[in-house]
């Protein structure tokens, strides 16, 4: 997925496959372009068909941790063919609300993030207290996954991840699932005591329950 768009700051913006296809959109951030790439992969799987791929495109899940946790969340939000999204420790720009992160210290907030991952205009327009002028925030990004399944995983041992900003974002987003009476399709878990991007045993049952229920169509308790 990294090959679709800009991965690190020293990689020149506008020189990746997405940018060559859509040069007028070169100011887009990498996350929207990576999500576009995932959608094209799903297009290919659907075109080839299950006989060739042995993949049921009605049961596609996407997951990732850290920057890839952000990537998973964007992919799940923007493609309705993704049945299950599991975003592990996605940090700022993932599930954490920018407005809340601005009130915290030592976290990935809008003034301290990798701007090659987002629109170039974001820092110029919404730096400092201007963050409160954002027309949207990331509880809405999470809610875009609804009515499909979403699981958010946090790790409070890494302050940079801004789980204090992810929690209210997740709580706000889950109200959308609750409104439709499908609250079993969304959950979140914040557990410490383990390295970054390592799934602890305490979270494994919840992860397995989401996989069982939304990818394998088995009975499982997700709330």
Where are the regions that the model predicts?
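Cap/lid segment of the alpha/beta-hydrolase catalytic domain
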Residues: 1-57, 94, 98-100
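Alpha-helix capping and helix-loop boundary segments enriched in small/acidic/polar residues
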Residues: 25-32, 62-63, 73, 128-136, ...
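Extended catalytic-interface subdomain
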Residues: 33-44, 62-65, 87, 121-155, ...
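Primarily recognizes the serine-hydrolase "nucleophile elbow" in alpha/beta-hydrolase
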Residues: 39-105, 130
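Mobile cap/lid helix-loop segments that gate and shape the active-site cleft of serine hydrolases
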Residues: 50, 87-141, 162-170, 178-183
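Conserved strand-to-loop "acid loop" that flanks and positions the catalytic carboxylate
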Residues: 146-164, 192-193
